[in-house]
Amino acid sequence: VGARAVLGRTSVALAGVAVILTGIPASAKPAAGSFAEALAYSIAHPGVTPPGSNDYSCVPSAQHPEPVVLVHGFLENSYDNWASLSPNLADAGYCVFAIDYGNTGPVPALGALESIPESAAELSTFVDSVLAATGAEKVSIVGHSKGGTVPRYYARFLGGDRTVARIVALSPPNYPTAGPPVQDDVLQRLNEGSDTVTGIEYTTIVTRYDQIVVPYTASLLTGAGNTNVVLQDVCPANVVEHTGISYDPLAKRLVQNALDPENSQPISC
């Protein structure tokens, strides 16, 4: 109870700071340029979803047969995490679906508050609904922060090995970190034996300037089928941090290349 009270006060403070810093009124058009702008908009418009997402009439194309499921991180929501990447993916021809989960705190816009196993159960239900609506056999999942770890739990323990083609994760806390605690006991169980599941393609995209997952190497997987990408190894001048990575042009291009490696596009720094 005490921890939740502290989290509640933190959530309210964070919400107020976001609105004060961005100054976006409730009547503004949806922001897609930065996390801070999108957070403020999502607080003023509870339940808003990112552009290009959650069209349950979408029919997957032959080029992109797997719908893309976007999974936000801790104290985030589908809009503030994916207001830039979601329309990019939709414009590229993907059926895009963005989950909001774990919205149990005093500010609905700040989600992913439940445990990794509970969050993975919500993701499982959401994926089932996407598969039922689209007729697809599998999905690809893109997650940020905790939203990159939750799909791994789903894949290993809740049947996701049968429904997930690939997992692309941005700055996920895959191993214990000096930053905010992420259920180290769950991570130990999740990583035991192998930190990947056979048959799933993994791409883990990280930044050396991550101030939440510390050290940033706690994101990196070692199992078969995974590709680790450090942004600064690709573009040394890139300085994006943890929260901004889902808005970073380089990271977004790497996500799209990971989703469709046969048609990957050149990288521009």
How should these model regions be labeled?
Residues 68, 96-98, 167, 202-204, ...:
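Conserved beta-strand scaffold positions in the cores of enzyme catalytic domains, especially
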Residues 90-106:
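Conserved alpha/beta-hydrolase
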Residues 87, 91, 156-157, 257:
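Short, well-ordered alpha-helices that flank and scaffold nucleotide-derived cofactor binding pockets
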Residues 198-269:
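C-terminal catalytic-base region of ester-bond hydrolases, centering on the histidine
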Residues 73-77, 108-115, 178, 239-245:
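Second-shell loop/turn segments in exported
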Residues 71-72, 96, 117-196, 205, ...:
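Serine-dependent carboxylesterase/thioesterase catalytic core
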Residues 75, 103-105, 174:
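Alpha/beta-hydrolase active-site loop signature
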Residues 2-92, 268:
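Flexible, membrane-associating and regulatory peripheral segments of lipid-active enzymes
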